From Swiss-Prot:
F-type ATPases have 2 components, F(1) - the catalytic core - and F(0) - the membrane proton channel. F(1) has five subunits: alpha(3), beta(3), gamma(1), delta(1), epsilon(1). F(0) has four main subunits: a(1), b(1), b'(1) and c(10-14). The alpha and beta chains form an alternating ring which encloses part of the gamma chain. F(1) is attached to F(0) by a central stalk formed by the gamma and epsilon chains, while a peripheral stalk is formed by the delta, b and b' chains. It comes from the Eukaryota. This is ATP synthase subunit b', chloroplastic. In plastids the F-type ATPase is also known as CF(1)CF(0). Belongs to the ATPase B chain family. GO terms for molecular function: ATP binding; proton-transporting ATPase activity, rotational mechanism. InterPro entries: ATP_synth_b, ATP_synth_b/b'su_bac/chlpt, ATP_synthase_B_chain. F(1)F(0) ATP synthase produces ATP from ADP in the presence of a proton or sodium gradient. F-type ATPases consist of two structural domains, F(1) containing the extramembraneous catalytic core and F(0) containing the membrane proton channel, linked together by a central stalk and a peripheral stalk. During catalysis, ATP synthesis in the catalytic domain of F(1) is coupled via a rotary mechanism of the central stalk subunits to proton translocation. Component of the F(0) channel, it forms part of the peripheral stalk, linking F(1) to F(0). The b'-subunit is a diverged and duplicated form of b found in plants and photosynthetic bacteria. It comes from Spinacia oleracea (Spinach). GO terms for cellular component: chloroplast thylakoid membrane; proton-transporting ATP synthase complex. Its main location: plastid. It is found in: Plastid, Chloroplast thylakoid membrane. The chain crosses the membrane at residues 83-103. The lineage of its organism: Eukaryota, Viridiplantae, Streptophyta, Embryophyta, Tracheophyta.
Length: 222
């Protein structure tokens, strides 16, 4: 019976084909020595004193402030630059004043001076043409002096009037320019004050956050 089972099993088993497997070359592995890093030896937390931790947090806070706060010289330069950054109001007013004086000189003062020179020349010609009589010469001289005095008084009055008018106009324009500059100064100071408050608030929040982080890192977690 056993022989029959062996014969039947030998008949039913399929023929297996032998496959040749080529061996893969094996390269030797290089063994690099591993560096063993020893953790820093910290003192046990039970030996730390609370006063030491507080002093460490206090000394660390100015260091963080020194890195966060800008240099005072740079802040002063920025503030000066923002305070004195004005428009061209005053130079424009001065240019208008100079242009007005130039126009008055060309339109009014120069023709008036030429007219007075011609009048003086004509009076001198009349005086030279008069006969050498004492009475007539005295009368003509008195008339000429009176005319000259009247002309000079008229010219001085006109000049004073024009100077007052131009001075009032220039003062009004200067006052307007000063008002504009004061408004701009107030706006600039307000914006600087707001920026200062915002910076202080942000620095306070950063300082509190940094101090909390330092305390959390140094103090033991309960």
């Amino acid at each position: 019976m056993a022989n029959m089972l062996v014969a039947s099993s030998s008949k039913t088993l399929p023929t297996t084909t032998t496959t040749t497997i080529t061996p893969k070359p094996k390269f030797p592995l290089l063994k690099t020595p591993l560096l063993k890093l020893s953790p820093p030896q910290l003192p046990p937390l039970k030996h730390l004193n609370l006063s030491v931790l507080k002093s460490a947090a206090i000394t660390a806070t100015p260091l963080t402030l020194s890195f966060l706060l800008p240099y005072p010289s740079l802040a002063e330069e920025i503030e000066k630059a923002s305070l004195f950054d004005f428009n061209l109001t005053l130079p424009i007013i001065m240019a208008e004043f100079l242009f007005l004086m130039f126009a008055l000189d060309k339109i009014y003062y120069t023709p008036l001076g030429d007219f007075m020179d011609k009048r003086d020349a004509s009076i001198k010609e009349q005086l030279s043409g008069v006969k050498d009589t004492s009475s007539e010469v005295k009368q003509l001289e008195e008339q000429a002096n009176a005319v000259m005095r009247a002309a000079r008084a008229e010219i001085s009055a006109a000049l004073n009037k024009m100077k007052k008018e131009t001075q009032l106009e220039v003062e009004a324009k200067l006052a307007e320019g000063r008002k504009k500059i004061e408004v701009e100064l107030q706006e600039a100071l307000g914006s600087l004050e707001q920026q200062k408050e915002d910076t202080i608030k942000s620095l306070d929040s950063q300082i509190s956050a940094l101090s909390d982080d330092i305390v959390k890192k140094v103090l033991p977690v309960s």
